[in-house]
Amino acid sequence: AGHWRDQREKIEQGAENVVQALRRYATEGGAHAVAPEGAPVPLHEAAGEAFEKGFQYFHEAHDARWGGFGGAPKFPRASIIDFLFRSAALQGVDTDPGQAAIGMAATTLQRMAEGGLHDPIGGGFHRYSVDEQWHVPHFEKMLYDQALVALNYLEAQQATRLPVFGWLARDIFAYVARDLT
């Protein structure tokens, strides 16, 4: 409320700028985004730059030995894995960056399944691991994690053609159907 009272004109001008940019976007058929200085930037170029920067960031953060991103505690980070599969598709799955993205995602998913994050008895995946090797799970399972991780495993199966990833997705679905519904 204080910002509205103190900076109302600035907020209204910002809103007007957004509306004008959306109008230009709609008028141009969505083919171009508008850069801050007004020069049109093709959307595929802007998306490519964003994916490239994101890919570099996650490549540097990736734990090549144990999979995942960063140290303990380690979470599945389904959105990062999803980003890596999208990045591979955008860059080309047969290119070096595409293969690197698939490799980071697949290594992470494989290490998660081999470690204590996957519950081989009850099915599904625990929320996170308290150690960097994925050995010691935090004994809690969340429905939303099951959904996101299952999608990651399905995409991994499609990208790598390794049946184990599809099997793990089915394991998650069976756990959810049996214990969480």
Give, region by region, the residue ranges found by the protein language model.
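Replace the tail clause
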Residues: 1-181
